[in-house]
Amino acid sequence: MIKVAVNGYGTIGKRVASAILAQPDMTLVGVSKTSPNYEAYQAQKMGINLYVTKESLKEFEEAGIKVKGVLEDMIKEADVVVDATPNGVGAQYKQVYSSMGKRALFQGGEKANVADVSFSALCNYDEAVDKRYVRVVSCNTTGLLRTLCTLNRVSKIAKVRGTIVRRAADPKEVKKGPINSLVPDPASIPSHHAKDVNTVLKDLDIVTMAVVAPTTLMHVHLLDVTVSSPVTKEDVLSVLSSTPRILLASGKSKVSSTAEIVEVARDMGRPRNDLYELVVFEDSVSVRGNEVFLMYAVHQESIVVPENVDAIRAVSGFADGRKSIEMTNASMGIGKGYLV
């Protein structure tokens, strides 16, 4: 069993912790929190071992939250640490993980040089095997890479031009916006997403633009992909529908918005309304010669969760990427084919 610690129990950390609990080959040592908020109370109610920094011990005691120990105790017990701390904090913790001889995963908010390799399970699982430090790319980059590495199986990609409509905040983030504006993110081109894709697909010609929209549900990507040889729409739909972690939303289902996608997730009984899969609007898929056009939605809170699980196996020396993906998908109910 791989013993895993999760440093940070926010949007990503709590989902990764739940995913670890579902794995047949992993055990959750515990999670860490810096403040005794509702997430800490929920972790306690779920029976998850809670670890805190030495500085916050008294605050947790005063809040009546029982802790298992301090952060260093948790790290000491683990084989792998999943760092789910806020952007930039993970790089600071790397020294701690290194000094204690632990392998660690970092999230996409960290700079690429924090790790030995940036990771996307469908693209470069093999590159992460036995590495000490792996960075799981961000939600948007995960969506881009999952799509591009899938399309690349039909015809080698020559170039990509993409527009990303980013959600303004997660549903719980009450202090973020905008609430009545569209904001270029940034106005200069390319956006950072193209550069991040190149940390995995290093030679790909890709340019992205991004805008922040006043919504909390999902991101939406609009891609124009030029491939090296002509393909058909049927070729594209076939590879998309047969690839794990990608779902098609058909026009017949009347699912035509991110709101309806999230509603389907609710109706499916998904924990926290999560959709680990990329959701492609089937009617958007169009082919003109060597160009493939499509639109898809990315659930920013959960798309990276199965990627973290696979990365845990990779750094632990599990060499069979396809098998890892199958194990993760089976344990978490992750599908392929059609959303409805």
From Swiss-Prot:
**For this protein, what is the EC number?**
1.2.1.59
Active site location = C139 (nucleophile)
Query: Where, per UniProt, does this protein localize?
Result: Cytoplasm
Q: Which InterPro entries match?
A: DapB_N, GlycerAld/Erythrose_P_DH, GlycerAld_3-P_DH_AS, GlycerAld_3-P_DH_cat, GlycerAld_3-P_DH_NAD(P)-bd, Glyceraldehyde-3-P_DH_2_arc, NAD(P)-bd_dom_sf
User: Its principal location?
Assistant: cytoplasm
Q: Which SUPFAM superfamilies match?
A: Glyceraldehyde-3-phosphate dehydrogenase-like, C-terminal domain (SSF55347), NAD(P)-binding Rossmann-fold domains (SSF51735)
Enumerate the Gene Ontology biological process terms: glycolytic process; lysine biosynthetic process via diaminopimelate
- What CDD domains has UniProt attached to this entry? GAPDH_II_C, GAPDH_II_N
GO molecular function (one): glyceraldehyde-3-phosphate dehydrogenase (NADP+) (phosphorylating) activity
Which pathway does this polypeptide act in?
Carbohydrate degradation; glycolysis; pyruvate from D-glyceraldehyde 3-phosphate: step 1/5
Which reaction(s) are listed as its catalytic activity? D-glyceraldehyde 3-phosphate + phosphate + NADP(+) = (2R)-3-phospho-glyceroyl phosphate + NADPH + H(+); D-glyceraldehyde 3-phosphate + phosphate + NAD(+) = (2R)-3-phospho-glyceroyl phosphate + NADH + H(+)
List ligand-binding residues for D-glyceraldehyde 3-phosphate.
S138, C139, N140, H193, A194
Instruction: Please tell me one Gene Ontology term that the record gives under cellular component.
Output: cytoplasm
Q: Where, by residue number, does NAD(+) bind? A: T11, I12, G109, R167, Q300
UniProt keywords (A-Z) are:
Cytoplasm, Glycolysis, NAD, NADP, Oxidoreductase
What does the record note on quaternary structure?
A: Homotetramer.
Q: Which NCBIfam families match?
A: GAPDH-II_archae (TIGR01546), PRK04207.1 (NF003251)
Q: Which family does it belong to?
A: Belongs to the glyceraldehyde-3-phosphate dehydrogenase family.
Name the record gives this protein:
Glyceraldehyde-3-phosphate dehydrogenase
Q: The organism's lineage?
A: Archaea, Thermoproteota, Thermoprotei, Sulfolobales, Sulfolobaceae
